[in-house]
């Protein structure tokens, strides 16, 4: 390996609320403060995704308006 061409690999702190995670990185700063907790993101937590979707007025209105709409084959009731 050539000397002087690679960035320094050092301890790096990730701070999320009161939690601190220690890892290694070449990032020039020694730490990063996260505003949003990645563990509570809807992409990683299915329960939270449902809460977010239900609280969003646009999605809620759409679901109310088209709740009876279905795709695929269904048996029609005889009249």
From Swiss-Prot:
Pfam families: Ribosomal_L31. SUPFAM superfamilies: L28p-like (SSF143800). Keywords: Ribonucleoprotein, Ribosomal protein, RNA-binding, rRNA-binding. GO terms for molecular function: rRNA binding; structural constituent of ribosome. The keyword rRNA processing does not apply. One of its GO terms (biological process) is translation. Part of the 50S ribosomal subunit. Belongs to the bacterial ribosomal protein bL31 family. Type A subfamily. This is Large ribosomal subunit protein bL31. It comes from Rickettsia bellii (strain RML369-C). The lineage of its organism: Bacteria, Pseudomonadati, Pseudomonadota, Alphaproteobacteria, Rickettsiales.
């Amino acid at each position: 390996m050539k000397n002087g061409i690679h960035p320094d690999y050092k301890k790096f702190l990730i701070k999320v609320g009161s939690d601190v995670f220690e890892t290694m990185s070449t990032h020039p700063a020694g730490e990063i403060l996260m505003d949003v907790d990645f563990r509570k993101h809807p992409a990683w937590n299915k329960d939270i995704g449902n809460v977010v979707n239900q609280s969003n007025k646009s999605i809620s209105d759409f679901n109310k308006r088209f709740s009876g709409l279905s795709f695929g084959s269904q048996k029609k009731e005889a009249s």
